[in-house]
Regions:
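Active-site beta-strand->loop->alpha-helix modules in alpha/beta enzyme cores, enriched
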Residues: 1-122
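The feature marks non-catalytic terminal segments
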Residues: 48-56, 60, 77, 122-196
Length: 196
C-alpha cells in the first residue's frame, strides 16, 4: 500500500505514523536487553522502522512517531485520534490505513483499527482502509477487499529490502534485528509470495 500511495500521490504526500514505542516486544525480555533503558530500546526499534520506510521511499520528515510527540503517555490512542483528525482536516483527499479493528492477533493493532473505525463511523474521516494479516482475509467478503501487490521485480525488491532492515544485526550501529526476531514468521511468509 505504501508503494502504491507513493506512486499515486507522490513522496511528499505519504505519511506513516507509528503508534507504539515497541517496548512490549518479547525480545526485550531477553537477558541481553536487561540493562538497557526504555529510551535505548525505543531507539533500536525506531531505527529499524525508519530504515524500512526509507527503503520503501517514505521521506524521513513524513514518519511520525507518537512516542516522540508524547513521551509520557501510556495510552497513545487519543494522540492517534488527534493526528488522524489533523490529517483529515488539513490535507486534501486523505486515505487513512490502520490495522483491522477486529481481525488481528495483537490487541494494540485491534485498538488502532478501532480508533480509525470509530472516526469513520462518526463521519469524521472520509476514507479508511484496514491492513489485514493473510490468515484473516477470509473473513472479509471479496467485494470489500482492496489488495495491493507489487507490479514488478523493482517493487518486490523494495519490499524485500524493507523487510531485511528488520533483520540487520549490527550492534555497534544500534541495529539488533528486534523486528525480525520478534515476528520472523510474518516477514518469512510475506517474502515467500512473488506478488507480496
Amino acid at each position: 500500500a505504501i508503494l502504491r500511495a507513493i506512486e499515486t500521490c507522490g513522496k511528499d504526500n505519504v505519511y506513516v505514523v507509528l503508534v507504539s514505542d515497541g517496548l512490549g516486544v518479547n525480545v526485550f525480555k531477553d537477558e541481553a536487553y536487561k540493562n538497557m533503558t526504555k529510551e535505548q530500546k525505543k531507539e533500536i526499534r525506531d531505527k529499524e522502522f525508519k530504515a524500512a520506510l526509507r527503503q520503501l521511499g517514505v521521506k524521513e520528515k513524513n514518519i511520525i512517531l507518537l512516542s516522540d510527540i508524547d513521551k509520557d503517555s501510556k495510552n497513545r490512542f487519543e494522540l492517534m485520534k488527534k493526528i488522524i483528525l489533523e490529517f483529515e482536516n488539513n490535507l486534501k483527499n486523505v486515505t487513512h490505513i490502520s490495522h483491522h479493528y477486529e481481525y488481528d492477533d495483537h490487541p494494540m493493532h485491534i485498538k488502532n483499527g478501532q480508533v480509525l473505525k470509530n472516526l469513520k463511523d462518526e463521519g469524521k474521516v472520509k476514507d479508511a482502509l484496514y491492513f489485514m494479516k493473510p490468515q484473516y482475509v477470509k473473513f472479509i467478503p471479496e467485494k470489500n477487499r482492496v489488495i495491493y501487490q507489487v507490479n514488478d521485480m523493482s517493487e518486490y525488491n523494495k519490499v524485500k529490502k524493507a523487510c531485511y532492515e528488520y533483520k540487520i544485526v549490527d550492534i555497534e550501529n544500534g541495529r539488533h534485528g528486534v523486528g525480525y526476531i520478534s515476528a520472523h514468521s510474518y516477514f518469512d511468509n510475506l517474502l515467500k509470495s512473488p506478488n507480496l
